[in-house]
Amino acid sequence: HPWVFEGEVIRVEPSPENGERAQNGCIVDVFEENGTYQGTGLLSEMSKIRVRIVTRNANDRLNEAFWSRKISWAWEHRKTTMGNRALPGTEPDTNCCRVIFSEADGFPGLIVDRYENVLVAQVGTVGMERLRDAIYPLLLEVFSADGQVIDGIYERNDSPSRLKEGLPQYKGWWTGSSSDENSLIAESTPT
């Protein structure tokens, strides 16, 4: 896993840009004792996993363009692994899938599932909690650019693991709403 555990942290230094100490959930650079860059990640002061690495490229800036590229890559990857969805002009085999799978897609602590025209998001880390209002609109933009209709994002942030990060539990619509809480799911259409 791309993690730095609490026992591996020797010190947290102030930011060279503003001289302030990194706060819980902030983006931080990780270095070995000898100064060798190891990656950039999200700080979690309450977790035994102190930093979750997002990139090992020192030139990456974790800005809107960075997250948008990662979302686009994850979505394109899912489309190519979901049967007929990858073939132009064919009906998809399914209208549901896991769009973002946490560390596997470079979004530590974020899971996003698609159920027909609704995205269901689970945020499990303080770093992703701080970034969610920046990432969710990018999800909608990526889907829209691909011709996909998404009516809303529903948050299922009621996992007990959030308490270990010092986060409250809640669930509800981030955007959109549905009078019908059910979605029609198609999977493995017979041929």
Where are these regions (language model features)?
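Fold-independent oxyanion-binding glycine-rich loops
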Residues: 7-8, 123-124, 156-158
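Non-catalytic substrate-recognition/targeting regions of SAM-dependent transferases
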Residues: 102-107, 111-113, 132-191
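Short hydrophobic-aromatic micro-motifs
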Residues: 30, 39, 119-122, 186, ...
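Non-catalytic accessory regions of SAM-dependent methyltransferases
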Residues: 1-116, 171, 175, 181
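Generic alpha-helical secondary structure
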Residues: 64-68, 128, 132, 136
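A short interface-forming secondary-structure element
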Residues: 116-129
